[in-house]
C-alpha cells in the first residue's frame, strides 16, 4: 500500500513539473458569508469562483487550490442583561430618621456589555414613628442619665465638658470642677480614627466611635513640631507622633496580570489574625455610595484599561505617616448616631434593616493604624513592548523606581541607571521608560483629591510637573487618611445596649448575607480563563496574561493554553439546625468546572457552624442582654460520685430543666420539638447502678417547619408550621421559574419531594428567546417557528390557569404549552389568571370575564392575556389593568340593562362600564342585553 502511494506521489510531481503551476488567484474569492452567530464565536466562510476549463485541468488547479476558507467571527460573548427582583416589604419606621426602607435584590448582574440595572436597590419613604429617638442603655442605676438617653459616669457631671453630647450634664451646675487646668485642642483629624470601614468596598464610612469624648481624664500628648500638647480621646490607648519616615522606602512590584495584583493587595489589607477571623472577600468591590468609592472605582479603571491591550503592570508605592494610634480593647464610647442606629434595630431579624448598618457605618472599625497618606501608582505597559525592550522584570521595576526619583517626585539621591535609558522601549520614547507605559492610574490615599489625581498621567501627555508630589505631600497634612491599619468586626461594638446579644447575632447573620451580595460567584465564567469580579450590579472580567478584550475574549499570538481553571459557584442556603446544634452549607466547583487540565478550586466545598434551635414554636426573638449570655461550657463540671449523667434521648427530643447529674430515683420527662409529638411512655428514672430505666418513646412528626429556601423564592402560603397533608407553592419573580418542582407536601417523614438547599430561580424558557422570537416560538435557522408543546416544553415554566372553550373546563397548564398552542392556532384555550387554578374570587372573575369578552369590541394582546373594552395593557407588567368606571367612554355600543350595588336599581351601561364595575368586585345583575325599558 505504501509503495502505491509513493508511486502516485512521484507521478503527481512529474505532472506538475511538466505543467505550468496553477495561479489560484486567477479565481477570485466570494465575499465572506454572514456570521453563523451574532455572539459567542461564530464562523463564516467564502468560496473561490472556479471556472472549470482547460487551464483548470491542465494545471491541476483542483489539486493545488484551496476552494473554501472559514474563519471565526463575532468572538465577543453574548451580553447578559441585569435583572432585579421585586421590592420587599417596608421596614418599621425609624424614629431618628422618620423614614422606612425597602430593598430589592439583584437576581442576575449584567455582564459582557448587557443592559445595566438603572433602578435603585434601596428606596425610602417618610413615615410617622411610634417611638421617640432616644438612646436606651442597660444598667443606668448609678450613672447620670443624659437627655438623649445615654448614661455616663456620675463623676462627669458638672465638670465643664459636654460629656453627654447634648450638654445636659452641665445644666443647673452651681460650681464646675474642671478636669484640666486649661482648654487643650484635640488631636487633629482624631474623628477619622473613629470612622467605620467598609471592608467589601475598601473605603471609610460613617462615624462609629465618639473620639471627642475624653471621659473626665486630662491625658495629653505632645508632638515635637507643636509647642502646645493635644488632649487625648478616652477611646485611644496610645498615640505616638514620633513617626520616622524612611526616605528611601519606595517599593515596586511587577504583575503579569491583575489577578495576581488583586490577590496580593487583598492579603496586604488585613493583619494575619484578622484574615482568619473574617471572611476572605476582596476589597475591590462596588459601594452603593460610589461617589465616595475612590479606591474601588480606581481599580475598576485599571481593569477596563487592561481590556484595551495585552498588558503587564508595575506598581510603585510609599507610606507617609504623621502619627500612629491604638484603640482601647474595651469600654469604647460609641458615636451618638451609631448608638441610636443600634438601639432602634428591631428585635425580629430583618435583612434590609440590619444591612443598612453596613451601608452607613461599614463592616469593621479601626483597632490601630496611622494617619497620613499613601503614594500609590500602577503603570500599565504593553506586554509585547516590555518583552521587546530586553529588560527583565526586576530591571523594569528598577527603571520605574529610578525615573520616579529622577523626576523629583520624592527628592531622593539617585544612581544613574544606563539600562533604563538605553533599552528599546526607552529609546523609542526619548529616553523615558515611564513615557513608554500606556498610562498610570492613581490609587493614592490621603491628601486633596485634585493633587492625588494629578500624580497620574495618560500616554501622549507631558506627565506630572515636578512640584505635584510636594503639593500632594503638603495636602496630606490637612487631609490625612487612615493607612497601615488593623480592623475588627463592627459587631464587636454591639455592647451595653438593650438586647445586645440578640442584635449582635442578628448583625452577624446579616453580615454573611450582605457579603454574599458582593460575591462574584453570581457572575458567568469569563472567556480564556479570566476571573469575574462583581462591581455593583455589573460583572467585570479580569484577564489572564496574554489575553485582553472587553471580556478577555482576545488572545495574543503567544497564548496557546486551552485549560480552564475551576471557579466556585455560590454557597447553598444553610441547612436546618441538627440535633448537635450545627448547621452546614455547600458549594460546587462548577462556575466553571475544571476543563482540559485546568486547576481545581482552592478551599473547602462545605462549611459548618454552631446554631440554635427553638424547642417550642417560635413566637418572636427573645431579648438577650450581655449579662444573660452564659453557656454550659462556662459552668464547672460536677463531681459524679453518685447518680446518673444525662439520659440518651430519641431523635428530635429534649428534657426540661436539663442537668449534668441526676440523683438516684429522679425522673425526667421526655418532650418533643415543635412539629413532633411523643408516642409511648415519656418518663425515665435514674437507677442505683447509675443507668436509666428503658422507656419506649419516640417523637413522631405531626407537622413540618417552614423550609429554608433562597431569598429569591417566595413561599405560599407563608406559615411557621405546616400540618401533615398541607402543601406549599414556590414561586419566582416574573420572567423566572423554579429550577425544579414548585409544589411540595408535608408528609410524615418530611417535605415531599425533598427541598434542595440549592433550589433557585432560572430564566423561563419563554424569556430566554424573547429578544429573538415572539413568545411561543423558537428560532430555526433565520426564521421563527412555533414551539411543539410536547417536545419543547419539558423545561419548567410558570403555571397558568387556562379555560378550554371546547370542553368548558378550566385546568392548570404550563405557560410554554399555552403559548405554543396559541401559536399553532389553538383558539379554544383562554388565559384565566397566572398561577394554578384554585377556587376563589380570582377564578370566578376570570371565568365571568371570558363570558363577557364574547361581545367585546376590543382585543389587544398583552403578555399571556388579551385585554378587552374595560381594560388597558400595562407595559410595565404585561398585565391587563381594569379601568375605573368613570374612565369608560360614553359610547352606546354593546349596551346592557343591569342592577348595580345594594340599591339594585336598573341602569343602562355599555360593556366597558359593566366590565369595570365587575372587576371592582361590585355586585351586578345583568337583566338583558340592550337598554333598560323606560
From Swiss-Prot:
Keywords: Calcium, Complement pathway, Cytolysis, Disulfide bond, EGF-like domain, Glycoprotein, Immunity, Innate immunity, Membrane, Membrane attack complex, Metal-binding, Repeat, Secreted, Signal, Sushi, Target cell membrane, Target membrane, Transmembrane, Transmembrane beta strand. It is a multi-pass membrane protein. InterPro entries: C6_KAZAL, C8A_B_C6_EGF-like, FacI_MAC, Kazal_dom, LDL_receptor-like_sf, LDLR_class-A_CS, LDrepeatLR_classA_rpt, MAC_perforin. All cysteine residues are assumed to be cross-linked to one another. Individual modules containing an even number of conserved cysteine residues are supposed to have disulfide linkages only within the same module. Residues 138-175 form the LDL-receptor class A domain. Ca(2+) binds at residues 156, 159, 161, 163, 169-170. Residues 642-934 are annotated as: C5b-binding domain. Component of the membrane attack complex (MAC), a multiprotein complex activated by the complement cascade, which inserts into a target cell membrane and forms a pore, leading to target cell membrane rupture and cell lysis. The MAC is initiated by proteolytic cleavage of C5 into complement C5b in response to the classical, alternative, lectin and GZMK complement pathways. The complement pathways consist in a cascade of proteins that leads to phagocytosis and breakdown of pathogens and signaling that strengthens the adaptive immune system. This is Complement component C6. It comes from Mus musculus. The gene is C6.
Amino acid at each position: 500500500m505504501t509503495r502505491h502511494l509513493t508511486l502516485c506521489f512521484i507521478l503527481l510531481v512529474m505532472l506538475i513539473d511538466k505543467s505550468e503551476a496553477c495561479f489560484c488567484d486567477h479565481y477570485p474569492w466570494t465575499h465572506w458569508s454572514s456570521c453563523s452567530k451574532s455572539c459567542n464565536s461564530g464562523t463564516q466562510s467564502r468560496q473561490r469562483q472556479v471556472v472549470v476549463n482547460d487551464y483548470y485541468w491542465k494545471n491541476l488547479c483542483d489539486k493545488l487550490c484551496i476552494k473554501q476558507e472559514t474563519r471565526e467571527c463575532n468572538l465577543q460573548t453574548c451580553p447578559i442583561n441585569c435583572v432585579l427582583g421585586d421590592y420587599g416589604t417596608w421596614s418599621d419606621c425609624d424614629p431618628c430618621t422618620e423614614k422606612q426602607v425597602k430593598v430589592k435584590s439583584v437576581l442576575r448582574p449584567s455582564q459582557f456589555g448587557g443592559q445595566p440595572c438603572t433602578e435603585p436597590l434601596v428606596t425610602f419613604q417618610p413615615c410617622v414613628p411610634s417611638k421617640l429617638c432616644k438612646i436606651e442603655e442597660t444598667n443606668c442605676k448609678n450613672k447620670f442619665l443624659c437627655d438623649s438617653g445615654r448614661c455616663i459616669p456620675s463623676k462627669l457631671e458638672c465638670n465643664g465638658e459636654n460629656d453627654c453630647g447634648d450638654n445636659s450634664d452641665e445644666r443647673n451646675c452651681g460650681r464646675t470642677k474642671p478636669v484640666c487646668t486649661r482648654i487643650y485642642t484635640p488631636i487633629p483629624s482624631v474623628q477619622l480614627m473613629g470612622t467605620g470601614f467598609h471592608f467589601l468596598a475598601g473605603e471609610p464610612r460613617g462615624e462609629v466611635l465618639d473620639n471627642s469624648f475624653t471621659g473626665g481624664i486630662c491625658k495629653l500628648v505632645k508632638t515635637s513640631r507643636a509647642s502646645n500638647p493635644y488632649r487625648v480621646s478616652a477611646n485611644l490607648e496610645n498615640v505616638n507622633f514620633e513617626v520616622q519616615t524612611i526616605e528611601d522606602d519606595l517599593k515596586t512590584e511587577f504583575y503579569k496580570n491583575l489577578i495576581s495584583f488583586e490577590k496580593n493587595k487583598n492579603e496586604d489589607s488585613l493583619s494575619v489574625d484578622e484574615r482568619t477571623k473574617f471572611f476572605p472577600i476582596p476589597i475591590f468591590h462596588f459601594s452603593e455610595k460610589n461617589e465616595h468609592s475612590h479606591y474601588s472605582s480606581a481599580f475598576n479603571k485599571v481593569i477596563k484599561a487592561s481590556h484595551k491591550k495585552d498588558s503587564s503592570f508595575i506598581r510603585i508605592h510609599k507610606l507617609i505617616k504623621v502619627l500612629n494610634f491604638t484603640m482601647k480593647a474595651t469600654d469604647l464610647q460609641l458615636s451618638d448616631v451609631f448608638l441610636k442606629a443600634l438601639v432602634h434595630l428591631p428585635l425580629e431579624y430583618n435583612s434590609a434593616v440590619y444591612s443598612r448598618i453596613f451601608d452607613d457605618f461599614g463592616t469593621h472599625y479601626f483597632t490601630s493604624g496611622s494617619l497620613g497618606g499613601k503614594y500609590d501608582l500602577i503603570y500599565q505597559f504593553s506586554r509585547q513592548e516590555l518583552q521587546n525592550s530586553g529588560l527583565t522584570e526586576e530591571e523594569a521595576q528598577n527603571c520605574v523606581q529610578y525615573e520616579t526619583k529622577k523626576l523629583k517626585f520624592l527628592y531622593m539621591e539617585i544612581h544613574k541607571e544606563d539600562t533604563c535609558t538605553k533599552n528599546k522601549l526607552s529609546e523609542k520614547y526619548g529616553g523615558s521608560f515611564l513615557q513608554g507605559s500606556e498610562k498610570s492610574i492613581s490609587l493614592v490615599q490621603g491628601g486633596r483629591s485634585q493633587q492625588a489625581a494629578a500624580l497620574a498621567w495618560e500616554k501622549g501627555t507631558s506627565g506630572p510637573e515636578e512640584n505635584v508630589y510636594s503639593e500632594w505631600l503638603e495636602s496630606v497634612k490637612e487631609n490625612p487618611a487612615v493607612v497601615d491599619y488593623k480592623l475588627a468586626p463592627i459587631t464587636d461594638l454591639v455592647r451595653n445596649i438593650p438586647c445586645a446579644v440578640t442584635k449582635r447575632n442578628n448583625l452577624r447573620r446579616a453580615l454573611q448575607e450582605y457579603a454574599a451580595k458582593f460575591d462574584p460567584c453570581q457572575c458567568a465564567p469569563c472567556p480564556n480563563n479570566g476571573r469575574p469580579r462583581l462591581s455593583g450590579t455589573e460583572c467585570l472580567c479580569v484577564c489572564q496574561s496574554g489575553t485582553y478584550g472587553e471580556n478577555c475574549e482576545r488572545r495574543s499570538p503567544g497564548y496557546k493554553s486551552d485549560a480552564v481553571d475551576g471557579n466556585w459557584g455560590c454557597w447553598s442556603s444553610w441547612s436546618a439546625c441538627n440535633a448537635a446544634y450545627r448547621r452546614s452549607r455547600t458549594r460546587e466547583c462548577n462556575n466553571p468546572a475544571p476543563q482540559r487540565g485546568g486547576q481545581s478550586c482552592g478551599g473547602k466545598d462545605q462549611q459548618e457552624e454552631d446554631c440554635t434551635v427553638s424547642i417550642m414554636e417560635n413566637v418572636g426573638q427573645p431579648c438577650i442582654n450581655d449579662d444573660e449570655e452564659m453557656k454550659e461550657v462556662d459552668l464547672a463540671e460536677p463531681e459524679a460520685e453518685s447518680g446518673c449523667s444525662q439520659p440518651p434521648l430519641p431523635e428530635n427530643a429534649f428534657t426540661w430543666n436539663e442537668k449534668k447529674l441526676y440523683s438516684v430515683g429522679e425522673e425526667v420527662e421526655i418532650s418533643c420539638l415543635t412539629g413532633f409529638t411523643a408516642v409511648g411512655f415519656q418518663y425515665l428514672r435514674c437507677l442505683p447502678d447509675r443507668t436509666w430505666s428503658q422507656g419506649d418513646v419516640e417523637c413522631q412528626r405531626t407537622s413540618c417547619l417552614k423550609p429554608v429556601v433562597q431569598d429569591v423564592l417566595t413561599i405560599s402560603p407563608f406559615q411557621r408550621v405546616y400540618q401533615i397533608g398541607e402543601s406549599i407553592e414556590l414561586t419566582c419573580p416574573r420572567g423566572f421559574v423554579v429550577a425544579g418542582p414548585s409544589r411540595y407536601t408535608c408528609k410524615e417523614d418530611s417535605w415531599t419531594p425533598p427541598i434542595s438547599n440549592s433550589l433557585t430561580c432560572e430564566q423561563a424558557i419563554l424569556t430566554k428567546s424573547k429578544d429573538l422570537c415572539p413568545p411561543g416560538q423558537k428560532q430555526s435557522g433565520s426564521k421563527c417557528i412555533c414551539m411543539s408543546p410536547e417536545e419543547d416544553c419539558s423545561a419548567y415554566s410558570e403555571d397558568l390557569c387556562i379555560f378550554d372553550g371546547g370542553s368548558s373546563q378550566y385546568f392548570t397548564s404550563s405557560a410554554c404549552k399555552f403559548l405554543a398552542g396559541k401559536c399553532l392556532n389553538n383558539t379554544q384555550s383562554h388565559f384565566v389568571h397566572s398561577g394554578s387554578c384554585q377556587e376563589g374570587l380570582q377564578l370566578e372573575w376570570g371565568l365571568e370575564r371570558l363570558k363577557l369578552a364574547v361581545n367585546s369590541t376590543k382585543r389587544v394582546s398583552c403578555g399571556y392575556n388579551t385585554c378587552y373594552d374595560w381594560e388597558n395593557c400595562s407595559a410595565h407588567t404585561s398585565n391587563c389593568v381594569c379601568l375605573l368606571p368613570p374612565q369608560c367612554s360614553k359610547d352606546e355600543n354593546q349596551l346592557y340593562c343591569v342592577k348595580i350595588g345594594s340599591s339594585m336599581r336598573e341602569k343602562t351601561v355599555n360593556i366597558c362600564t359593566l366590565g369595570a364595575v365587575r372587576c371592582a368586585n361590585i355586585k351586578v345583575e345583568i337583566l338583558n342585553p340592550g337598554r333598560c325599558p323606560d
